[in-house]
Amino acid sequence: KAIRAAGSRAQLVTLSNNASGGFVKALGDNAPGTIITQVFPNERSITSPLVKEVLALAKAKNITDLSPAMLEGFTSAKVLVEGLRRAGPNPTGDKVRAALEGIRDFDVGGLSLSYSPSDHTGLDFVDLSIIGRDGKFRR
């Protein structure tokens, strides 16, 4: 808001952790046109196995609109559960870390996720979305 209040018309770009309705609401009239990096497929992409899986679970809870943050949270939970499973029946922080760092080509709904002791990136997927005049994320 401060950038716009200062009169700047610069194109604003932010990270995926700001891909939420709360962020859009906080920006108010300044939200449209803001570009957000996305590390997951479009939440309306019904061809994505990940989106299909999340949509099915959301429908069961009467949730009709998915957000980019929901896809990230769901995937993070899925990866954590896999790390705990691989860590064994008595997980410790060290065991969970080693288990997560041993994940290679783990399918998280059509996306391949890998970690190593030196690379915690996970996914190589990147896309961009822009906030529309209606406050929705567009691709």
What name fits each language-model region?
Residues 1-139:
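Extracytosolic ligand-binding ectodomains
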